[in-house]
Design a protein with these regions (language model features):
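M16 family metallopeptidases and their MPP-like homologs
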Residues: 1-5, 19, 23-25, 34-63, ...
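A generic secondary-structure signal for well-formed alpha-helical elements
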Residues: 4-9, 26, 98, 106-114, ...
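An aromatic/glycine/proline-enriched structural segment found at the starts
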Residues: 5, 48-52, 87-152, 309-340
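Peptidyl-prolyl cis-trans isomerase
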Residues: 7-10, 14-16, 68-70
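PEST-like low-complexity, intrinsically disordered acidic/proline/serine-rich tracts
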Residues: 13, 25, 29-35, 116, ...
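Conserved, carboxylate-rich catalytic/transport cores that coordinate ions
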Residues: 77
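Short beta-alpha junctions and helix-cap segments that line functional grooves
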Residues: 103, 118-119, 130, 163, ...
Length: 340
């Protein structure tokens, strides 16, 4: 491990191979309605210059992949891999007394060096009133995305919002799934997410639906967003059910080394207190209906929603325009406007 960290080689043939693989992955993502939506969405929310503007899939763009050289990788490693900017996380049957001598032997010669400071940047609130369309001729489904920029991580309401998300779009019996899948049979499954980050996070709903229910499903998604944000807060038996679901799973949450490792990574990367997960179960059990309602109001803002629909536009565009949700912009698969 130390040799890889301290003396990376980046063989030219393997760099070329990985670039080909990454380009192939990008092509596959663009061919799939759901993943092409997740590629485009960040630029619609953050613009093109923000640190979070890159595709949510993590694969980048063809032009940037093509431009990367072996020298770029070596330069990046020299710049960012520093001991005083690193954290080593070890999980297993080992003590610090056993671990420290081995670490000193392996990494003791790694000279301290300051890495540049990263600037995440700010971003304006989503203005809403925009509907973006991407054509996928003959697609049997439309992928509907409703999204906006929300608050940064590390707020007091984070834990309550985690619980809201589970009941809104994080389970097979969540509100979105009960509506679009179980009740109406328009979708195989929906998702609501708010990925963790240090800067302003995206909140988004992804709802693949049968194409002939695109317009109607957008109406239902908008209704559910208004509901959870205040018109119909989580309460009563619905609240009790989600709390039972969340608390019954707590004892086994950290049964594996992988789970412990992920928790430690969260603490380091997101700036959580060291005792965040030690107090996690207690804090979850202390949540009440008001805490969930307050969190939903902080993080979910229906008036700021930006819409993105990927589907067969010759079949669905007219119905979408009838909703009068705002300016309609057609995009290509790279997220650039094709409006004349």
């Amino acid at each position: 491990m130390a040799d890889v960290v301290l003396n990376p080689v980046y063989p030219a043939d393997l760099v070329a191979l990985e670039k080909r693989r990454q380009r192939s992955q990008i092509g596959q993502e663009k061919a799939d309605p759901r993943t092409v939506a997740l590629r485009i969405l960040p630029r619609l929310l953050y613009g093109t210059t923000h640190a979070y503007a890159n595709p949510f899939t993590g694969s980048g763009d063809e032009s940037t992949v093509d431009a990367i050289t072996r020298d770029d990788l070596l330069r990046w490693h020299r710049t960012w891999f520093t001991p005083n900017g690193s954290t080593l996380i070890v999980t297993g049957d080992v003590t610090m007394a056993q671990l420290e001598p081995a670490l000193n032997a392996a990494f003791g010669g790694w000279a301290r060096k300051d890495a540049p400071k990263k600037s995440i940047g700010t971003v304006a609130k989503s203005a809403g009133g925009k509907v973006y369309l991407l054509d996928k001729p003959d697609a049997p489904q439309s992928v509907i995305v409703a999204a906006h920029v929300t608050e940064r991580g590390g707020l007091p309401q984070d834990l309550a919002m985690e619980t809201v998300l589970r009941n809104f779009g994080g389970m097979s019996t969540s509100r979105l799934n009960r509506n679009l899948r179980l009740d109406k049979h328009w979708s195989y499954g929906t998702q609501a997410a708010m990925p963790a980050s240090r800067g302003p996070r995206p909140f988004y709903v992804v709802a693949p639906v049968q194409w002939d229910k695109t317009k109607e499903a957008m109406v239902e998604v908008a209704k559910e967003l208004r509901g959870v944000a205040g018109e119909r807060p989580l309460a009563g038996e619905e609240f009790q059910s989600i709390m039972r679901n969340q608390t019954l799973g707590l004892p086994g949450r950290f049964d594996t080394l992988d789970a412990l490792e992920r928790a430690a990574i969260d603490i380091v990367s997101l700036g959580y207190p060291d005792d965040y997960y030690a107090n996690y179960a207690k804090n979850v059990r202390a949540l009440d209906e008001k805490a969930l309602a307050d969190a939903a109001k902080v993080f979910i803002r229906p008036d700021e929603i930006v819409w993105l629909v990927v589907g067969d536009l010759k079949k669905v565009e007219a119905g979408i325009r009838e909703l009068k949700l705002g300016e309609v912009v057609r995009l290509d698969e790279s997220g650039k406007s094709t409006n004349e």
